[in-house]
Each structure stands twice: as C-alpha cells, then as structure tokens.
Swiss-Prot record:
It is an enzyme of class 2 (transferase). [4Fe-4S] cluster 2 binds at C146, C150, C153. This is Ribosomal protein uS12 methylthiotransferase RimO. Its EC number is 2.8.4.4. The lineage of its organism: Bacteria, Thermotogati, Thermotogota, Thermotogae, Thermotogales. It comes from Pseudothermotoga lettingae (strain ATCC BAA-301 / DSM 14385 / NBRC 107922 / TMO) (Thermotoga lettingae).
C-alpha cells in the first residue's frame, strides 16, 4: 500500500513518525511524499494548545474534503485524538480510522486492519524499532509522558505518566542513525531532565549522554526540553564537557515574575533561574541558551509583565519562543479567575518579541570574527545554508555561508563569522 504521512506538532511526533515510516516499509508498504499518490494518509496531530489544535483540525478537514474527489483511507492519530476522539469522530465522519496515543507498532497494525477506532491508555514508548530518517538530523525520543504539575499544561492528561526508554534501546537507535549518515541527533522528551527516574530510581540523563558520546562517528548530539527546576550540575557539566554534545540548553522558564511562576506550579523563582543561567555560562560563555515564555497567564498584571521583561534583560537568552496563554480543559489554570483579555495578551506578546529581538541581536554580535563549527545542510548558487550549535532545526536561526568551494552535504565545516542580525549569522569557509 502507498502511504503518505503528515506530521503536525512537536519534534516528538516527528520521532514517532520516523519510526512508524520504517516499520511500514519493513512490512512491505511504500511511503510517498506526494499525497496525490497515496492510498492511505496518516495525520499525526497535536492537542497541546489552542493554536496547535486548530491547525490539526484544519488539516483533518482539508484531507476529509479531498476524499470527495479521490477515495483513500484516512487515518488520524495522536494527541488530539487522545483528548477529543468522541467529539471528532462525530463531527468528521469522513475519517476512516481514529487512533490515540499508541506505539508506532500498534499504529502500523491498526492501519493494516483498517481499525476504525482505537483510543486507550497511552503507550508511546517503544524499545527496539527500525528507524527511518530523510534529513541530516534526527529526533530521538528518550521518554514520553510527564509527572510534573504545571498548572497550565494538559500534556499529563493525555500522555500519561513519565516513561523512559532504556539506555541500551536509545544507544542502539542512535548507533543505527549514525551508521546511515545522520549528522545531528536531537534528544527529546516532555522533560529530558527526568530521564531514567522510573527505570533507575534517579535521573540519569548525564549517564545517557556519556554513553551516547562513546558512539563512533562524525556526529553531534543536541538535548531539548531541559526543565529548569530539575536541571542538575551533573547534566550541565556533561553537556558542556562531552565532545559530541552541542553546548545548547533549551530551558523553558515560562515567566520571570515570582508570583506568576508560583501560580504556574514552578519550583524555582526568578533569582534561582538567573543563578542557573550564570552557572551554565561560567562553564561555557558561548553556550546557547534557549527558552520559552508565556504571556497572558490568568492574573498576569502589567507589573508581572514588566518583571518578565526585566528578567529577560538580565538573563539575555540567545533564543526565545513566546506563547500566548490559552485555557486548556482539565488544567488547574483553566479555572483560575482574572483572565487576561486576548487584546492585552497579544500586545504583550508583540512587545516581548520586539524587546527580545534586540537582546538576541546583541548576543549574536559576539560571534562576529570568531570561528564556528557548522553543519552545512543545503545549498543554492551563491550560498550554503548551515546550522551552528546555536541553531536547533525549525525553531532557531541559520548560518549563511558564502560559496567559495565545493563541500560534502551534509557535513561539518569550520566557518569564520562575518556578520549577524537578530536571528542569523553569515560566514565564510576556512
């Protein structure tokens, strides 16, 4: 069967679908990039925040409408289905199969059997599985689910308890990816700092990193989703000292007002977060620190928002993502009073991004005149397009490299940085 896969949402979905693609190929199916050729289409959805849910629903409706002109088997899976399967199945009857948060093996079997509906206790963590990857980088999921108690977050409601994969399983997957030519391994989970607590009775992310660092090959490792409340000195030391680890810290602090942080269910206050950032930079001044923040949380005042801006001024994050709060069914914050209007939340969002852009510009300027090791991934007639340790795929910037000689793509090269703006760097091959 010719199968097309449409992935929405976070990198964890991409990791699952890469595994699913490999399983389907092993079972004799053909994966097609042109949906017009597909006999079956799988849509992997996101159910985290309002904008992501809307994107998923719009995509489902688009494909449901396609069926008016050409018959094919339409399967919708993932987080949105896990949360709203009954409502969705009633509203969009054109979908042939609704599958919740299941392992890639279960998904493959359900599609082959044309299972119309399968939503049960989440079972996304897998040990041994084949692996497919069509990029120079690959997401590797080391755990799923979450045991944290952030008041705004619905993920534990549909992902379930935190579940780690074994070190051996992850090592085997990374080794296979390196063997097929992947140059950057990106470790993901809802909270990578919690890795191992359920299997080894303690967090062992640092041990996992040391094990993966021993794999032979010319590749690098990036770690995403480091919860600031549980990021330890050992973890920081491992990321800063191991030669295959990129000095990149993705630390979602969420806010800078102590009052709002407390209402969010976070543990560390703004001063402790600044101490964490200072500790990282004391180990590697050029380490990239990325964060995510939220505006419009219930009860957020002008003073709270100003404290967030003051915090960002002190923290000087290299990269930042900002979200506007939305009520999520079943969360503690959804029942909180003193909601912030959409207009005010949008104003704060736009003002924050403008404010942060100047910080990012000043941070990137420090690399002009320096040499950086970059991964060249694309080319045109005049330039190569690359990423440095500062740049996670899809969410950060890039390095534009003047084309002065032929190089292997993908490949690592040393580049002298010649210019910068708020998000991107320019450079020349050495």
């Amino acid at each position: 069967m010719k199968i097309g896969i449409k992935v929405l949402g976070c990198p964890k979905n991409e990791a699952d679908c890469d595994v699913l693609e490999a399983i389907l190929k092993d079972r004799g199916h053909e994966i097609v990039s042109d949906i017009e050729e597909a006999e079956a289409v799988i849509i992997d959805t996101c159910g985290f925040i309002e904008s992501a849910k809307k994107e998923s629903i719009d995509e489902i409706i688009t494909f449901a409408n396609y069926k008016k002109y050409r018959p094919f088997f339409l399967c919708v899976k993932g987080c949105l289905v896990q949360r709203y399967s009954k409502e969705l199945s009633k509203e969009i009857p054109e979908v042939d199969s609704w599958l919740g948060v299941l392992s890639p093996h279960q998904i493959a079997e359900a599609i082959e059997k044309a299972t119309p509906y399968l939503v049960e206790k989440p079972t996304v963590v897998y040990e041994e599985a084949p692996r497919s990857c069509n990029n120079s980088f690959a997401y590797v999921k080391i755990a799923d689910g979450c045991d944290r108690s952030c008041t705004f977050c619905s993920i534990p409601l549909f992902k379930g308890r935190f579940k780690s994969r074994s070190i051996e399983s992850i090592y085997s997957e990374v080794e296979r990816l390196v063997e097929i030519g992947v140059k950057e391994i990106i470790l993901v989970a809802q909270d990578t700092t919690a890795y191992g607590v359920d299997l080894y009775n303690k967090a062992v992310l640092d041990q996992l990193l040391k094990k993966l660092n021993s794999i032979e090959g010319n590749f690098r490792i990036r770690v995403m989703y480091l919860h600031p409340d549980h990021l330890t000195d050992k973890m920081i030391d491992a990321i800063c000292s191991l030669d295959k680890l990129l000095p990149y810290f993705d630390i979602p602090v969420q806010h800078g007002s102590d009052r709002i942080l407390k209402q969010m269910g976070r543990i560390k206050n703004s001063e402790q977060l600044l101490e964490l950032i200072a500790y990282i930079r004391s180990h590697n001044p050029d380490a990239a620190i990325r964060t995510s923040v939220m505006v419009g949380f219930p009860g957020e005042t002008n003073d709270d928002f100003q404290k967030l801006l003051d915090f960002l001024e002190k923290a000087k994050f290299d990269r930042l993502g900002c979200f506007i709060y939305s009520d999520e069914e079943g969360t503690v914050s959804s029942s909180m009073k003193r909601k912030v209007s959409e207009r005010i939340a949008r104003e704060r969002y736009e003002n924050l991004l403008i404010f942060q852009s100047q910080i990012a510009y000043e941070r990137l300027k420090r690399f002009v005149g320096k040499n950086l090791n970059v991964l060249i991934e694309q080319e045109n007639e005049l330039f190569y397009v690359a990423r440095s340790h500062l740049d996670a795929p899809e969410v950060d910037g890039e390095v534009t490299v003047k084309k002065t000689r032929e190089v292997d793509i993908p490949g690592y090269y040393t580049v002298r940085i010649t210019d910068s703006d708020e998000y991107d760097l320019k450079g020349e091959l050495i």
